[in-house]
């Protein structure tokens, strides 16, 4: 649906889109990062809409105006964090899990802050993390 420079810009774009066509509030935010084995670098926020929901939007939504992302095999996990973005250690554990299972992860990471809750210690964020697979090294 769109590429935004950061989550704040993504939220503004989401409100703009959701106010134009009923149902576009089902857009998801994915922070796009790269991982070089030590550090994470953020590259902005993508607004994604699941194509399976398109039929529910009616004729007001023209999907041909938006780029489609390709389906890719990914290493996937859900973790809790005190931050809205994953730490390098979280991503390193995903890479390690992949290696253990014969999967080589690419350097790209997509993070979605699915939900958050607050307690006496502050905010906790539930992060959904995807790392596209570069290649299958060996079958388990």
Feature annotation, model-predicted:
Residues 1-140:
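A solvent-exposed interaction/effector surface
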